[in-house]
Structures are given as C-alpha cells and as structure tokens.
C-alpha cells in the first residue's frame, strides 16, 4: 500500500448528502475481486448517461476536475452496503482523500485499509472547502497528514483529528498484511520460544 504523507491536488466538490456505496460503485461492477479497473465504474450512474456517453454536468467530467485526487463531499458519505469495492473504485480513479462531515463506519475503516484518507470536518469547514473546490483547475488543496492540516488555495488552514493508529498506518503504508509483516520478527521469536517450551504442541 502506498504511503500517505502529504498530498497536493485538485479537489472536486460533490455537495450531495447520503452518497451510498451503490452510488460510488454500482452493483454491475461487483463481479470482480480485483482492485484494479474499477475506476471506470466510479459514480457510473451519475458520470454517464443511459447511452454510455458522459454526463457533462457531473463534476468529474468537467475540465479541471478529471484528474481530481481529493473529493469534498456531503454528509454521511459511504453509507449503505459494506462493499469494499467502493474505496477500490475511488483509489483506482485516483482519489486519495475524501473530506466530509461524517462517514459510514464500515466505509470509513475500509478507506484506511486501502490507502485512502477520509477526513471529518465541521460543517462550517466543509462549506469553506466546498467553496475552495468550486474554483475548477484552481481548486488545489494540500493535505498534510503529519501535521493533520488542510491548506486551502487562499492560504487558510483547517486542522483535523485522526486516530493515532490509523494515522501511523497511512504514513507508513501499512495495510493488514503490512501490519502483520511489521510484527514478523516478534511472531518468529514467539513461535521459536513456544516450540522450545511446548514441543508437544
């Protein structure tokens, strides 16, 4: 998993509340267990018309936002089913950070396991960031995970809270496998000692 330390990128505004995982990645794209290739299905029912053509009104189809790495979204982002394909689709598209006032718990935790930083902010801060993100190609934010701060295009700074363990995992690029490997030496030591003390086990 790629480390997340500091990210400077275009932020796309998506001021819609209760965006569920089916909206993030429709069920038609859930037939695979691969984490790659799902970016094409991200927000498919909003990004594309019924004939498959792009919906020019959707933010990620607008000039300046096509390569957005940050999403500024409405309240309760990621609600609905627990499909892990939702963060997979975001990451495959290129989104590394989602900012909202709240997230569904399962989606929130799945983001950390896949190298995405979900940031919770107060409504007044979200409103400010939504305004910043509405500047099109100039909608650049800097997310500094080490200092837990968001720097806006006008020089303003917003601080955010984050669990120390989750922050540690993102800063060091540790998913569940990475965490296990980090403890590999301790595991080997325990197994050797256990085999010596309990050879019958």
Curated annotation (Swiss-Prot):
Entry's InterPro entries? 3-IsopropMal_deHydase_ssu, Aconitase/3IPM_dehydase_swvl, AconitaseA/IPMdHydase_ssu_swvl, IPMI_Swivel, LeuD
What is this enzyme's catalytic activity, as reactions?
Answer: (2R,3S)-3-isopropylmalate = (2S)-2-isopropylmalate
Biological process, per Gene Ontology: L-leucine biosynthetic process
* One Pfam family per UniProt: Aconitase_C
Q: What is its EC number?
A: 4.2.1.33
Please name the pathway: Amino-acid biosynthesis; L-leucine biosynthesis; L-leucine from 3-methyl-2-oxobutanoate: step 2/4
Lyase: present as a keyword of the record? yes
What Gene Ontology molecular function terms does this protein carry? 3-isopropylmalate dehydratase activity
User: Gene3D superfamilies under this entry?
Assistant: Aconitase, domain 4 (3.20.19.10)
**Cellular component aspect of the GO annotation:** 3-isopropylmalate dehydratase complex
Q: Which UniProt keywords apply?
A: Amino-acid biosynthesis, Branched-chain amino acid biosynthesis, Leucine biosynthesis, Lyase
The free-text function statement in the UniProt record for this protein reads:
Catalyzes the isomerization between 2-isopropylmalate and 3-isopropylmalate, via the formation of 2-isopropylmaleate.
Assembly mode: Heterodimer of LeuC and LeuD.
The record's annotation in HAMAP family points to: LeuD_type1
Q: Which family does it belong to?
A: Belongs to the LeuD family. LeuD type 1 subfamily.
Name of this protein: 3-isopropylmalate dehydratase small subunit
Look up and give the organism this protein is from: Brucella canis (strain ATCC 23365 / NCTC 10854 / RM-666)
């Amino acid at each position: 998993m790629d480390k997340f330390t500091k990210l400077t990128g275009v932020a796309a505004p998506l001021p819609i509340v209760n965006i569920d995982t089916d909206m993030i990645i429709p069920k038609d794209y859930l037939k695979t267990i691969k984490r790659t290739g799902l970016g094409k299905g991200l927000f498919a029912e909003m990004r594309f018309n019924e004939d498959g053509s792009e919906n020019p009104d959707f933010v990620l189809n607008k000039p300046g936002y096509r390569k957005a790495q940050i999403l500024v979204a409405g309240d309760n982002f990621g609600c609905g089913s627990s499909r892990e394909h939702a963060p997979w689709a975001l990451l495959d598209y290129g989104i590394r950070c989602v900012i909202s006032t709240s997230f569904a718990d399962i989606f929130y935790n799945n983001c950390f396991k896949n190298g995405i930083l979900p940031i919770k902010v107060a409504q007044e801060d979200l409103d400010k960031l939504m305004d910043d993100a509405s500047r099109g190609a100039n909608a650049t934010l800097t997310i500094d995970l080490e200092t837990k701060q968001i720097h806006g295009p006008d020089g303003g700074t917003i601080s955010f809270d984050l669990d120390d363990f989750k922050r540690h995992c993102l800063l060091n690029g540790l998913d569940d496998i990475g965490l296990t490997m980090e403890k590999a030496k301790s595991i080997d030591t325990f197994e050797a000692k256990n085999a010596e003390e309990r050879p019958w086990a």
